[in-house]
Amino acid sequence: MTDTTGRIPLWIIGTVTGILVIGLIGIFFFGSYSGLGSSL
């Protein structure tokens, strides 16, 4: 096991970023669909 405390693998950054983007888009469309997005 190599020490990776000071360096984050790119695949972890890509995975987390992808999940956050998909989550934000999902919340946005869900809010618009339920009518809550109109107040934003």
Curated annotation (Swiss-Prot):
Q: Where in the cell is it found?
A: Plastid membrane
> Where are the disulfide bridges?
none
GO biological process terms held by the UniProt record: photosynthesis
Membrane topology field:
Single-pass membrane protein
- Keyword hit for Plastid: yes
Q: Which NCBIfam families match?
A: PRK02565.1
HAMAP family the UniProt entry points to: PSII_PsbJ (MF_01305)
Function of the molecule: One of the components of the core complex of photosystem II (PSII). PSII is a light-driven water:plastoquinone oxidoreductase that uses light energy to abstract electrons from H(2)O, generating O(2) and a proton gradient subsequently used for ATP formation. It consists of a core antenna complex that captures photons, and an electron transfer chain that converts photonic excitation into a charge separation.
- Give the record's family classification: Belongs to the PsbJ family.
Q: What is this protein called?
A: Photosystem II reaction center protein J
